[in-house]
A protein has these predicted regions:
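Function-determining surface determinants
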Residues: 1-303, 308, 315
């Protein structure tokens, strides 16, 4: 069953609100889930704005602020989890990893306090007002349908992903590869919108995006941890191990890079493909109407109101 972007946005706002209590308690799972919710909302809001005819700029900024505050704590949680994983895999470096884990936990405490204060300062109820059409922002008024807006954003995100993949090259550039991850995330959440609204259901695209995103996420976490160890001049053996792990996962990414190019190309073609599909369907519908109209005419009784009168067999 399909649903509209505004309805999806309202549901996702409810999801975000459901995690607020856990965020205030500093719970790892709530912070992660709330962060994902803000990511989804950032892609939904613009499309929903075109549906209800309201600018979602202020609401978007609100969600972005919430997402950034959540992201700061979420990254620390990911690094703590990675330290615990490596402690099991690298017993010889368990002491060094345990020390780093302790530092990360200490760093998390003030970050969690900042997160709670940030959320207290944000008027999150304004999100519900925005989706209900009560937002104080300007009217969109551009005449676009939400499907047109969605198609344009999918095309844009596809182009951004293609550019990021090309710029990352086949050599390991941590920051460039992180940009690939960011663009892939944005595109993936937009594809979710397309699937849930039944505007577009590309085979395997979202599944493939999730797989590559997982690899890129693993690389990013290890790179962040590596930089912390390097800055403190820690165990050279552990640093070498993390570097080797990154190299292995980067090789996995390169094996899937062609799939990213195909994803991006499909997304860039999407608006044109949809327009062509609508034209074909309209042409077929018009072709079906012609014989139906002909059959209707055959069954009609001739109108004799204007026929000439016949008197005595002659035409008068």
């Amino acid at each position: 069953m399909s649903t509209s972007p505004a309805s999806l946005t309202a549901t996702q706002i409810d999801v975000l609100f459901a995690h607020l209590s856990g965020v205030r308690d500093g719970r790892i799972d709530s912070i992660h889930d709330a962060r994902v919710s803000t990511r989804r909302l950032r892609e939904l809001l613009h499309v929903a704005g075109d549906e209800i005819g309201v600018s979602m700029g202020p609401a978007y900024k609100l969600v972005r602020s919430a997402g950034r505050a959540l992201g700061a704590v979420r990254e620390l949680d990911s690094l703590v989890s990675l330290c615990e994983t490596l402690m099991n895999l690298q017993p010889a470096a368990a002491g060094t990893l345990a020390t780093m884990r302790g530092r990360l936990i200490e760093e998390r405490r003030p970050a969690a306090r900042r997160l709670v204060k940030t959320f207290e300062s944000l008027d999150l109820e304004a999100l519900r007002d925005a989706v209900a059409g009560r937002h104080a922002g300007t009217r969109a008024g551009n005449g676009r349908t939400w499907r047109t807006a969605l198609g344009e954003r999918i095309e844009k995100r596809g182009g951004q992903l293609a550019a990021a993949v090309d710029r990352a090259s086949g050599v390991y550039f941590p920051k460039r590869l992180h940009q690939v991850r960011i663009q892939l995330k944005k595109l993936r959440y937009l594809i979710e919108v397309a699937e849930q609204t039944r505007a577009w259901r590309p085979a395997n695209l979202r599944h493939d995006a999730e797989r590559v995103q997982s690899v890129l996420g693993d690389i990013h976490d290890r790179q962040m941890l590596l930089e912390r160890f390097q800055s403190a001049d820690h165990d050279p053996g552990l640093i070498a191990t993390i570097r080797a792990d990154i190299a292995h996962r980067h090789a996995q990414y390169l094996l899937r890079r062609d799939r990213l190019h195909l994803m991006a190309a499909a997304c860039q073609r999407y608006p044109a493909d949809q327009a062509r599909r609508r034209w074909v369907l309209a042409s077929r519908a018009a072709a079906l109407l012609v014989p139906v109209a002909g059959l209707a005419l055959i069954g009609q009784t001739p109108d004799r109101s204007h026929a000439p009168l016949r008197l005595g067999g002659e035409v008068s």
